[in-house]
Design a protein with these regions (language model features):
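Single conserved hydrophobic/aromatic residue that forms the stacking wall/gate
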Residues: 2-9, 13
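Active-site donor/metal-binding and catalytic loop motifs
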Residues: 241-245, 272-296
Length: 326
């Protein structure tokens, strides 16, 4: 498991999240195995206590003999003048750089099976384990659901299986089957996602060829990456050429998130097949503790389901459809 974590000033980081974040991260590593995880953190230009807290985390990783690279630095002022997605793409690629430079063949002769990205969110180790086991662990990409006080947060990146946008208000999707899946907290096939925490089959980010894993259970819908030839390149007329390993990038034809473009490039490489991108609607992360408690606990109380019914079928659907579907 390769953990890639990125912190940077422009994302309004709250250093108050870092102690909980570090505890959850360390417990996750203990559960998975210290010798099976590589942690990469890239932090830049923070003006709060983040650098100090990251040094404490680094010391603890060293004490536990966990392979890691924590880079806390000040970036050139010119970087702040870059277009936002160009800047974020650069920073994400910096977080991935140790994956190629330090551990290109994995740890102790074992190739990595997953690349896990965790934003600056409140999360529990059980959420990581559940995400990695989405659909029996058979996926190209799997995502949690990230929340802010009103509801679902990452509407800019998430697209349903029909390429439609979603809304922040529960149950998020326009398609009836997808809405029912959210109501029953089941995984949902989507076109793209990120959502605070996302896991990839590591082969999407690997520059080393290796065969499909025998440990993956047989599924009717296998991860596309299991059978893609190497090397492979797509040179569409509309976009920049894409190849493996994936790189975060900008788009020259639309204003899209670097996170969404990663899913798009998976589609381009897999065409005419469809990559197995799954939203695990049962898994909650949030950007502050009160919101996390609200959606992880209070909104799961049985009495709240009456509010869900009244909101979905009467307020959201029948009265304010235009506004709630924006």
């Amino acid at each position: 498991l390769h953990l890639s974590l990125r912190r940077q000033r422009q994302m309004c980081i709250r250093d108050s999240n870092l102690p909980h974040y570090s505890r959850s991260l360390l417990q996750t590593i203990e559960d998975i195995g210290r010798d099976r995880v590589f942690v990469s953190i890239f932090e830049n230009n923070s003006t709060d206590a983040s650098p100090m807290l990251l040094r404490k985390l680094e010391a603890e990783l060293e004490r536990r003999n966990v392979a890691h690279n924590i880079n806390s630095t000040s970036m050139p002022s010119e970087l702040g003048m870059w277009e936002r997605i160009e800047r974020l793409s650069f920073l994400r690629n910096q977080a991935m750089k140790p994956f190629y430079d330090q551990v290109p063949y994995g740890l102790q002769g074992r190739p990595f099976t997953r690349v896990l990205w965790i934003n600056d969110v409140i999360f529990e180790p059980k959420t990581v384990h559940a995400l990695l086991q989405t659909d029996g662990g058979s996926f190209d990409q799997a995502c949690t659901v990230d929340y802010f006080w009103l509801g679902y947060y990452d509407i800019w990146v998430l697209r349903d299986k029909n390429q439609k946008t979603v809304r922040p208000l529960w149950p998020f999707f326009r398609d009836a089957d997808d809405r029912r899946a959210v109501e029953s907290r089941r995984p949902i096939a989507v076109n793209s996602c990120w959502n605070g925490m996302t896991a990839f089959d590591a082969r999407w980010f690997s520059n080393t060829s290796f065969s499909a894993r025998n440990s993956t259970p047989a599924k009717t819908w296998e991860p596309v990456i299991s059978s893609l030839p190497r090397p492979i390149i797509r040179n569409d007329s509309s976009e920049k050429p894409v190849t493996l390993p994936l790189q975060f990038r900008t788009s020259r034809i639309c204003n899209a998130s670097e996170s969404q473009l990663t899913s798009l490039d998976m589609h381009r490489l897999a065409h005419p097949r469809r990559p197995k991108i799954i939203l695990n609607s049962d898994l909650v992360v949030a950007y502050d503790a009160p919101t996390y408690y609200l959606y992880q606990h209070i909104m799961r109380w049985r009495i709240i389901f009456l509010w869900h019914y009244l909101w979905e079928y009467w307020v959201s659907t029948r009265i304010f459809t235009f506004f709630t579907n924006m």
